[in-house]
Amino acid sequence: LQDHLQLRITYRLNKPISFNDQYHSYLEKIKIGMEYYIKRSGPMAYPTAQVGLFTRSSPLIDTPDIQYHFSNYTIDEKTGLPDKFPGMTFSVCHLRPQSRGEILLRSTDADQHPRIIPNYLSTAEDCRVAIEEIRLTRKIAATEPLASVVDAELDPGPDVLTDEQCLDFARSN
């Protein structure tokens, strides 16, 4: 099994400009629904991620090995709904991880789900890229004009500073 781990790095914004704000406003929901119904445009016509980016984790490699999806919302993990404050999410993944997992049958019963062992971050290179993904995302968020609307990093959080802390976040994500 080869799969790429998706890290979600989230930020609280200092202005009501995210989908979170629209979602929690009854009037905005009506506007969104009407815009889609009449024009087939607006937030209901958008993909989940409106911005994508391919980049390299190191200048020493030839082709991009990191992919970003940027979404103008954050999700409350308890409810599965957009948070009640403005937010944005960077979903970042390593495109060509070296780590390999496995899928195992639990029994001969076809109704039994298989046992999936992704084995993420099992190589030093995959760990290096995960750390770089977090550091690079922080650089992007600290760059204008984006920096002017960022209020705070939520996940992994401003206290996550060392390589080991970044890896702990990646492993728990």
Q: Where is each model-derived feature located?
A:
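FAD-dependent oxidoreductase catalytic-site/capping-region signature
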Residues: 17, 28, 32-173
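Acidic/histidine-rich catalytic neighborhood
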Residues: 3-32
